[in-house]
Amino acid sequence: MDKLSGISSSSLPYKGMFSLLSIADKKHADSIYNPHVNGGFLLTNILQKCNISKVYGQEANLGKYKFDLMNLVINGADFKEIHIDQGNCITSPKFFNERFDVVLSEIPSSIIYDMNSKDRSFFTKLYDVEKFKRNLRRSEFPFIIHMLHQLKDDGVMAVLVRQNMLFRTFDEDIRECLINEKNYLDTVILLSGKLLRHSFDNFSILIFKKNRSSKDIFFIDASKDFDDKLTDENIEKIADAYASKKVIDKFSYLAGIDEIRENDYNLTVSRYIDTFEEDTVDLNEVLSKKVRLDKKLGGINEDIDYWLNELDLYD
């Protein structure tokens, strides 16, 4: 269990969808990187679905680091091709000069929020954060910047995020940079918070690519169709929509950059997909119910008249 994200490590359908989306465009990927290995469950799941030979990752927690290695080997990874290092990927990146075909992760809040002023200064200089037109604040974006740095130009990246980073006002500048200037964000997928053990707040998976030719962003709202469980059919529906970029009423939508700009780069899925269901009224059923109620009311009135006469209460 990831105590920070609340995601069950045994939630294989969720893990399966996450990994499936991250490799959808990289069926012949050679390398994969996870900056927050956290038990290795995402990595082992993706290795079962795709023949990726080189596995890279970091784990800040020393105890988990040893478990990560063991779990990967038990699940069939080649020990000689496993490159997992212990350390904080933000302040002590072990693979800074490497680039990977697939980069995927959940965001551990402790890595972000434990940064002191020295760490922030180091990170700002190392990653040239000023090009993103922002100062570091309490935000998930340093982690995302790190992941993008490690991604190949033709690679694909998937990251799980909380909803608030999609609309926070103080993060609008970096969203604008990643969307409009860099054109990295490809897809936003909203999922139900009931997939998480310790939260009912919805969350999203963001898909990034560096070699995009279009500035459109694809939105999928899977928060209502799939509640606290994802079946293989659910995953297939999401993956098919993602691969085809097909617009489906109340489920998926392709938004242009002008529309996103008009929304101040707010990425909340409900801004783009209307899932409101109007109540339908069966007039025949309503009329039938009215007849039944009128009949019942008539019987009650007859009873009242009877007792009023019996008790001689009429004027």
Model-derived features with residue positions:
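Class I S-adenosyl-L-methionine
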Residues: 1-58, 64
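Conserved short loop/turn motifs at secondary-structure junctions
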Residues: 4-8, 56-61, 86-92, 161-166, ...
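Well-ordered alpha-helical segments embedded in enzymatic catalytic cores
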Residues: 15-19, 67, 142-146
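Short, surface-exposed basic-aromatic patches at helix termini and helix-loop junctions that form
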Residues: 25, 47-50, 73-77, 175-182
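Short amphipathic alpha-helices and their capping/turn segments at secondary-structure boundaries
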Residues: 26-32, 86-103
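General small-molecule cofactor/ligand-binding pocket signal
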Residues: 56, 83-85, 189, 220
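S-adenosyl-L-methionine
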Residues: 67-97
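A conserved structural/catalytic subdomain of Rossmann-like adenosyl-cofactor enzymes
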Residues: 97, 101-315
